[in-house]
Amino acid sequence: MENKAERYQKAVNITDVLEQSPFAKIIKKGLAINEINQKFNRIFPQEFHGKFRIGNMTDNSIFIETANAIVRQGILFRQTELLKLIQEEFPQVTGFEITINPGF
């Protein structure tokens, strides 16, 4: 019973606890991906807007989900041009992977 009483007497900063939690890390990653999506909507040509989204970003690769194969092919057709535009904002990115998500 003594251990329980000691545990509750420790001063704990709730902010520190929340910042270190797995949930906080998920939220931070989600916010970062949302910010990247907004930047990409400014970078990518108008014809692609609303037809793709960034699913994830690693050190040197971006994972893009598209609505259909036509959008995927359009992005692949302009891959070199788009990669140069991406590298202006994210120089570490060396390529991207595109997947089709029919539910998108």
From Swiss-Prot:
InterPro entries: DciA-like (IPR007922). This is Uncharacterized protein HI_0907.
